[in-house]
Swiss-Prot record:
Protein family (similarity comment): Belongs to the DPH1/DPH2 family. DPH2 subfamily.
Protein's recorded name: 2-(3-amino-3-carboxypropyl)histidine synthase subunit 2
Keywords recorded for this protein, A-Z: Cytoplasm, Iron, Iron-sulfur, Metal-binding
Highest classification ranks of the organism: Eukaryota, Fungi, Dikarya, Ascomycota, Saccharomycotina
Cofactor: [4Fe-4S] cluster
Subunit structure: Component of the 2-(3-amino-3-carboxypropyl)histidine synthase complex composed of DPH1, DPH2, DPH3 and a NADH-dependent reductase, predominantly CBR1.
UniProt keyword annotation of Iron-sulfur present: yes
Gene Ontology cellular-component terms listed: 2-(3-amino-3-carboxypropyl)histidine synthase complex; cytoplasm
Subcellular location field: Cytoplasm
UniProt-listed GO biological process terms: protein histidyl modification to diphthamide
Molecular function (Gene Ontology), one example: metal ion binding
InterPro entries, alphabetized: DHP2 (IPR010014), DPH1/DPH2 (IPR016435), DPH1/DPH2_1 (IPR042263), DPH1/DPH2_3 (IPR042265)
Length: 481
């Protein structure tokens, strides 16, 4: 008897064993999440509804943290876990906190420290870092650097170790002028000593990411942690040299940056007709003000804009809006600017800084890349005499004949009274060319028909069709049953 054939197939994906995680001890949780200090803070204030925001890597500890806190805080205090943030994890999730009507947000892990619209306490935790390994990994790069100054900065979660790292670098490189950043709002942070938060001009302490006291091109930046793509790009264009140390891997790393790609996207925004303003943060205090500034600047430059709030942006969400030519993202400068996997989006995504450059009448690219929206120039001055002048698009290699929302000038009094009129193939509303009409004309599928355009073919005449039961009908010489 022959053997039966094997009908099963190999699985498409390999089976992965479940990750078994050892439950951390109470001592570890108390130290890592600064629970004694947090308990003292909560009991000394009148907050009754507390939202605990955890980063993705620490969500597994959230239930254990809540259990320990309930044993020590006032029984009238309600604790809620925010496990999935609406926007960047470094930002305070104001939207989620408002859903539960929280009085206070406790933000664990790395934070961007942007001003927010509600009370917040930052807990940077206490991740371990081997300072000796850090110095050894960075020694070669520091010795090869020509810059006399060194600025030490890090992810905010490593700020408890900042004094130790600072002293180690000073001892290892006495010939260098070494300065470091510090936390600007110590009253909102837990787990930091006075030494870690107090500025001292003699010691060279500086405010976080406010380095106006240094000549950037004469300074080497040392960053401890894993910077976001936007922060790495900003640092690479601002300082004379950069070096990064990842405490998790224990290795010095060099993040990839693509400044020329940003220049290309900026030119695409310059030639765009319709710009989508994508709000990628609702927690920042200047969100409304910046949104109005962007709308005004885009309108003054002769372009059309739409404002969108879609939660966490992804390819599928933004693909629904075909009329948008370029997306301008306003959000946290560290985690709210879309640079990761941007090639997957159907339309280019630019930052507010890039949009500000694109809207100017004359292109001026200094090579710097700014993440602070307050430093973006959105004052657009357009010469009315140059509105109809064509300009060259270096991306497509073509000339664009006019600004998208320019005003058509024509002298027929009867035609000027019309609300809607087709001029030279472009639809105008009150003498203004509309981007919606241009978008419709460029589409292969324009719907079932519209009232404009004399070149349309006449529709077929309506005739009475066949009637009766659908059987025994004939098509040509063939009989179909």
């Amino acid at each position: 008897m022959s053997q039966a054939p094997v009908l099963s197939t190999e699985p498409e994906f390999e089976t992965v064993a479940p990750l078994v995680r050892e439950t951390p001890s109470n001592d570890y949780l108390n130290k890592y999440y600064c629970l004694p200090q947090l308990t003292e803070y909560l009991n000394s204030h009148e907050y009754k509804s507390i939202a605990l925001q955890f980063p993705a890597n620490d969500v597994a500890d959230s239930a254990l943290v809540v259990r320990l806190l309930k044993q020590t805080v006032d029984p009238s205090i309600s604790l809620f876990i925010l496990a999935d943030t609406n926007y960047s994890p470094c930002c305070v999730d104001v939207v989620g906190a408002n859903h539960i009507k929280a009085d206070l947000v406790v933000h664990f892990g790395s934070a961007c420290l942007n001003p927010v619209t509600m009370p917040v306490v930052y807990v940077f935790c206490n991740p371990e870092i081997d300072v000796k390994v850090m110095v050894d990994q960075l020694t070669e790069q520091i010795k090869d650097a020509e810059q006399p100054n060194i600025l030490l900065d890090s992810d905010s979660k490593y700020y408890p170790e900042m004094p130790t790292m600072f002293k180690a670098l000073r001892e290892a490189f006495p010939d260098k002028i070494i300065v470091r950043s510090f936390i600007p709002n110590p009253q909102e942070t837990l787990g930091l000593s006075e030494e870690e938060t107090k500025p001292d001009a003699e010691e060279g302490y500086l405010y976080r990411r406010t380095h106006d006291d240094l000549d950037p091109q004469e300074t080497m930046l040392i960053y401890v942690g894993t910077p976001s793509s936007s922060l790495a790009l900003h640092y690479s264009t601002r300082f004379g040299a950069t070096a990064y140390f990842n405490p998790v891997s224990g290795q010095a790393e060099t993040p990839k940056t693509a400044i020329m790609k940003r220049y290309r996207y900026m030119n695409m925004a310059r030639a765009a007709q319709t710009i989508g303003i994508l709000i990628n943060s609702l927690s920042m205090s200047e969100t409304k003000e910046m949104s109005k500034k962007l709308q005004k600047a885009i309108a003054e430059s002769g372009k059309k804009s739409y404002t969108f709030v879609v939660g966490k942006p992804n390819v599928a969400k933004l693909a629904n809006f075909e009329v948008v030519d370029v997306w301008a993202v306003f959000g946290c400068g560290i985690g709210g600017i879309i640079l990761e996997n941007e090639e997957q989006y159907f339309k280019p995504v630019v930052s507010v800084y890039e949009l500000g450059l694109a809207l100017q009448p004359e292109l001026s690219w200094t090579g710097e890349w700014e993440i602070d929206s307050n430093k973006v120039d959105l004052n657009v001055e357009v010469d009315e005499d140059e509105v109809d002048e064509p300009f060259f698009n270096p991306v497509t290699g073509k000339f664009i004949d006019h600004k998208p929302l320019h005003v058509q000038e024509y002298s027929d009094d009867e035609e000027t009274q019309a609300l809607v009129k087709s001029i030279g193939g472009s639809l105008t509303i009150k003498n203004t060319v509309t981007t919606a009409a241009i978008q419709l004309q460029q589409r292969e599928w324009q719907g079932l028909g519209h009232d404009y355009g004399s070149g349309e073919e006449d529709g077929a005449d309506l005739e009475e069709g066949r009637g009766g039961i659908a059987r025994g009908y004939a098509v040509g010489d063939d009989e179909r049953m």
